[in-house]
């Protein structure tokens, strides 16, 4: 395995031509991400071989993550929906967040127990103003949805510690 120092010398572009790549995730030996301009979820390997894994119809896929059973989740922020890809490739609504906020939902992270955290910001600020207030919701494995944090300025990255006890939010 190369050291970080030697790996940095080997940095290279593995894919060009994206409209707007977002929500990078490593899954099953490939880098997956959303391409906002096309509505596609793309996976690319270290050699640059890419594959469109899913095209989300009529929505902008903001971010992705996987349930512990391997099913893909997609946050469609403008629509206020979390979609789930079934084994046959179909998309179904996993959670509807529209009743919680009229503002777009953004980032997603799933912990090892199947709890799903989704954050959303407030309305886009006017020039010179700040983002917020936003919120974080928890979608439990039983499907229930509840807000777990509010007054978040602009959460754009989350992680859960390996023991599933702490949600870390980049604000």
Residue ranges and their predicted role:
Residues 1-171:
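Sequence-structural signature of mature extracellular/luminal beta-sheet repeat domains
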């Amino acid at each position: 395995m190369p050291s970080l120092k030697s790996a940095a010398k080997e940095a290279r572009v593995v894919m060009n031509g994206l409209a707007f790549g977002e929500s990078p995730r490593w899954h099953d030996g490939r880098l997956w991400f959303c391409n906002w301009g096309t509505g596609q979820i793309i996976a690319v390997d270290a050699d640059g071989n890419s594959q469109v894994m899913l095209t989300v119809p009529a929505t902008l896929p903001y971010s992705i993550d996987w349930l512990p059973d391997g099913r893909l989740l997609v946050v469609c922020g403008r629509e206020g929906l979390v979609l789930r890809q079934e084994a046959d490739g179909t998309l179904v609504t996993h959670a509807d967040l529209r009743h919680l906020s009229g503002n777009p939902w953004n980032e997603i992270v799933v912990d090892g127990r199947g709890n799903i955290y989704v954050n959303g910001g407030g309305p886009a600020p006017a020039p010179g103003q700040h983002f917020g207030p936003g919120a974080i919701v928890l979608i439990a494995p039983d499907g229930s949805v509840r807000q777990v944090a509010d007054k978040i300025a602009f959460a754009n990255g989350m992680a859960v510690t390996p023991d599933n006890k702490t949600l870390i939010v980049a604000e």
